[in-house]
Amino acid sequence: MVTALSDVNNTDNYGAGQIQVLEGLEAVRKRPGMYIGSTSERGLHHLVWEIVDNSIDEALAGYANQIEVVIEKDNWIKVTDNGRGIPVDIQEKMGRPAVEVILTVLHAGGKFGGGGYKVSGGLHGVGSSVVNALSQDLEVYVHRNETIYHQAYKKGVPQFDLKEVGTTDKTGTVIRFKADGEIFTETTVYNYETLQQRIRELAFLNKGIQITLRDERDEENVREDSYHYEGGIKSYVELLNENKEPIHDEPIYIHQSKDDIEVEIAIQYNSGYATNLLTYANNIHTYEGGTHEDGFKRALTRVLNSYGLSSKIMKEEKDRLSGEDTREGMTAIISIKHGDPQFEGQTKTKLGNSEVRQVVDKLFSEHFERFLYENPQVARTVVEKGIMAARARVAAKKAREVTRRKSALDVASLPGKLADCSSKSPEECEIFLVEGDSAGGSTKSGRDSRTQAILPLRGKILNVEKARLDRILNNNEIRQMITAFGTGIGGDFDLAKARYHKIVIMTDADVDGAHIRTLLLTFFYRFMRPLIEAGYVYIAQPPLYKLTQGKQKYYVYNDRELDKLKSELNPTPKWSIARYKGLGEMNADQLWETTMNPEHRALLQVKLEDAIEADQTFEMLMGDVVENRRQFIEDNAVYANLDF
């Protein structure tokens, strides 16, 4: 579950009396998806966050500053913190030690009745008991009262009473668990990068806490990363702007509380055109925004317009900037902590508390206004950037109209080069974005015209990382894609209007093809990101080689496969190898059989797992700072496959 700023009312009184019991654990193993979302790889990793979040509660309450997560042999997980240790005295209602109640009873925790944590997003103890129920084995060690207490469980059932196993001069809690393979049938193997990304994010969002991740599964190659950011989300913004050119050296930073709502905001403008706004409530990434984002945007637009007019940078009232104009080239993070967060939206990642809007608006507007008046040169640059964005917006409006279709049935306005499919059901429809007209011809002949549409792209599309929306919308290839997809773009984007649920990038297997693929992915990431988040974007995998032996043909997709095939084939009859450099070299039948036929093809689905890394990668590869790109090329040249 989520965690937030915690305030334990009285250190001495944090004991069993404050752990309240609501209900039993029986349902968890029967319907695990209700408690952790799914039993897939994502649900498996969710177990780790349930335990880590409890440790973060302790840290934010001021009782811990170190958390360690270890992936042990056989994919055991160990989470250690140096907090006070879970209470071990007898819980009155259950007549059992509080630590056992927390680990075996659903909705038992220190967040009910006001006696434990004052502010917390999750229900402290819910996570622990759910993890216990879904674990093959779980062990707890509590360092408290100069004593080490220990208890072990199998599938949530205690194997013996809580016992004393030693003395200690430390305090804290250690929980070890192994996920139950009967529940997690897809996998019980943890992904280091998945854990690393969230742990880094938690370290940014909770400044001053040190969180360490260690992987001990391979004794020869133990991997460890430790994260500790005294600057918190200010450091986060600086990292996101690392490959950009900031307009002002230091991010604007505010960290204040009002009406028991803690507000932390960091914002820094750069010379680019993309907006990067990340919002969090009680450490949960609110992908769908919410009232904290609304309050911030409202204050930002109002204050910039007020400053622009009063300082005469903007001449008249009609020159007012829109919200979109004020956010061009802005990197910002909003993090709030609330005692009772209400989450809404399709994925429960939208903050709904109405009182938050006014609090964020008031705190941020006061601070931002003061910053502008104290830094007039930076203020002028930001306002003038907004004015340029407004002009581009007006110019883009006309171009945007060209890409708009009245409805999904408005076939007349579809691009002329598009060979559309006959099905009108988006769930089964796919569109192939094909490099070059000649390959486009082959794919049109070889496709299944009922469900497969083809849009040939001539040449390289515009690098959107270096362009404003008006210029982007004047690019013919981009305009055709927007019209064909039917979703709109930027602020007008509507995923529900997507005409295809598979958008397949199909380029040549050479350097030019890779460049076009990167340009397309940059466009999707910056202007149609929900397509990626919904899992609609794919990359086709055309074969690299055709190996012929007598009448037998083999299509091979990479060098490793080729080496394996060559080692397995008889030397007679003699075989020959042809390398495909372009899609146009294959006829329609070959393209269908190797790359487009759903029965045989291989597609790579584009996923967005680490927003920080994705943003930095696109900026580094496609942005203005040459030095970082040169360094990347030098570091990775050894892995390159060059075509001469």
UniProtKB/Swiss-Prot annotation:
The record's listing under HAMAP family reads: GyrB (MF_01898)
The UniProt site entry described as Interaction with DNA is assigned to 460, 463
Q: What else is known?
A: Few gyrases are as efficient as E.coli at forming negative supercoils. Not all organisms have 2 type II topoisomerases; in organisms with a single type II topoisomerase this enzyme also has to decatenate newly replicated chromosomes.
Query: How is this protein organized at the quaternary level?
Result: Heterotetramer, composed of two GyrA and two GyrB chains. In the heterotetramer, GyrA contains the active site tyrosine that forms a transient covalent intermediate with DNA, while GyrB binds cofactors and catalyzes ATP hydrolysis.
Instruction: State the Gene Ontology terms under molecular function.
Output: ATP binding; DNA binding; DNA negative supercoiling activity; metal ion binding
- The broad enzyme category this protein falls into is isomerase
Catalysed reaction per UniProt?
ATP-dependent breakage, passage and rejoining of double-stranded DNA
Which parts of the sequence bind Mg(2+) 2? 508, 510
Please state what the protein is called: DNA gyrase subunit B
Q: Which cofactor does it need?
A: Mg(2+); Mn(2+); Ca(2+)
UniProt: Mg(2+) 1 binding residues: 435, 508
The record's keywords, sorted A to Z, are: Antibiotic resistance, ATP-binding, Cytoplasm, DNA-binding, Isomerase, Magnesium, Metal-binding, Nucleotide-binding, Topoisomerase
E.C. no: 5.6.2.2
Question: Which PANTHER family does the record match to this protein?
Answer: DNA GYRASE SUBUNIT B, MITOCHONDRIAL, DNA GYRASE/TOPOISOMERASE SUBUNIT B
Q: What does this protein do?
A: A type II topoisomerase that negatively supercoils closed circular double-stranded (ds) DNA in an ATP-dependent manner to modulate DNA topology and maintain chromosomes in an underwound state. Negative supercoiling favors strand separation, and DNA replication, transcription, recombination and repair, all of which involve strand separation. Also able to catalyze the interconversion of other topological isomers of dsDNA rings, including catenanes and knotted rings. Type II topoisomerases break and join 2 DNA strands simultaneously in an ATP-dependent manner.
